[in-house]
């Protein structure tokens, strides 16, 4: 069997509000190398998973999200001015600039943004009978936690500015062949796991009396 490498990119709360830093010092810090040649690296305040070949990616990102098999990379970015709000159009423009600055085709990178500095990123692996899952996570839930069912605080149709950052960004990397339906189920499981972790922290929503999800 030809082993494919699958990837899930999950934005589990809000998008960031901020701008791309100008003049990135293009020094890459390799965080993890996979046996197939893919690499996780950090450059300034961005963490990138660079794909050596085609990978099947399922992403909830607004920027090149959905089901893709033509991406060059996926990334998680912490902006230099995280308190400066912007519209979705501004977010897209900033992500386009960032991708090009990093040397990628902006149409072939799926991105996330967060108020969490990339020095705080966590990378963990778990394996079972040859199947390995790598989780690459940033969590800034204390800044702006919400709960499913809370009143929406952002209206894209009205072109409002994005709210204060409050993200839990999860990137999951699988080293095995997975049917599309199972990959979608894995995204649901990741969401449930994130909710369980928040419940263990007894972290309340900023917008209601319930626990954050």
Predicted features, each with a name:
Residues 7-8, 25:
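Intrinsically disordered, low-complexity segments enriched in glycine/proline and serine/threonine
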